[in-house]
UniProtKB/Swiss-Prot annotation:
Family annotation (PANTHER family): MITOCHONDRIAL DNA REPAIR PROTEIN RECA HOMOLOG-RELATED, RECA
Record protein name field: Protein RecA
Subcellular location: Cytoplasm
Gene3D superfamilies assigned to the protein according to its UniProt record, in alphabetical order: P-loop containing nucleotide triphosphate hydrolases
Organism from which the protein derives: Rhodopseudomonas palustris (strain ATCC BAA-98 / CGA009)
Domain of life assignment: Bacteria
Amino acid sequence: MDKSKALSAALSQIERQFGKGSVMRLGKNDRSMDIETISSGSLGLDIALGVGGLPKGRIVEIYGPESSGKTTLALHCVAEAQKKGGICAFVDAEHALDPVYARKLGVNVDDLLISQPDHGEQALEIADTLVRSGAIDVLIVDSVAALVPRAELEGEMGDALPGLQARLMSQALRKLTASINKSNTMVIFINQIRMKIGVMYGSPETTTGGNALKFYASVRLDIRRIGQIKERDEVVGNQTRVKVVKNKLAPPFKQVEFDIMYGEGVSKMGEILDLGVKAGIVEKSGAWFSHDSQRLGQGRENAKAFLKANPDMTAKIEAAIRQNSGLIAEQILAGSPESDADGEEPMEE
């Protein structure tokens, strides 16, 4: 039996039945080879992700404790997409989006589509319709924990309805996943952390909404607040660590640290300084920072202020970091803990 003839007959039958392009050779499908990305708003995180940003046409999950910077990171991604002329939507299931803060992060709130649904089914139906339109570049669902099933809303307080939210998420993701890929829309699910009862070994932490999202997500980011940034006695920001817990596009388990300043978001200047020093692009001698024999300032805060006042110098250093990121990514992210043998490492506090 001639295998090539049999294959040709099978392919032509499939194309007659389901349309041209139902089956194709992977190498001839250029779109599947090139991954289009949108910057996360953090240069270090873009490098940690291995593809220069968060992938379009995929599902991304950002989870962490309260006030760790989940919504901030998602809004930075919206701002970056809007800079490229993209259309973004925000499904605000928590009814807690602050437009003033979003504007400070660089989001064009006049062009941002927002929905504040009454229940989980409505939220996911709206998300599905927007994704199927093919016009949306980034869609954010904030948050999975707030997607309350209609049956729970209509029931009494204290009613036991086990697995209802997990079933809702599982069904929604089955419907959404093909549309997301075809429309090349990035869908970011923000999620919260809960504690599992009776866990003796390993981390007791888990995310809400069942296991479906863990499987369907191409990228999962664990974001944690690890310290405070103070000016004298006043707290002006958080030191934040993001760990790439899952990555279908590049090696996972990389982690990166950056500052989130109140009212400003991710501190781009601080990140450029830190990454520049690790890459050898910015020289640090004692407390002085310099680049190409040009002094940037004494102390980190003064050097950040200098970079903020000199955007040309900032752009030059950032370009050098991006250019070398392929070579220095491993050094920048050195010290990332190795994964466990089963592929999922325990989450840190």
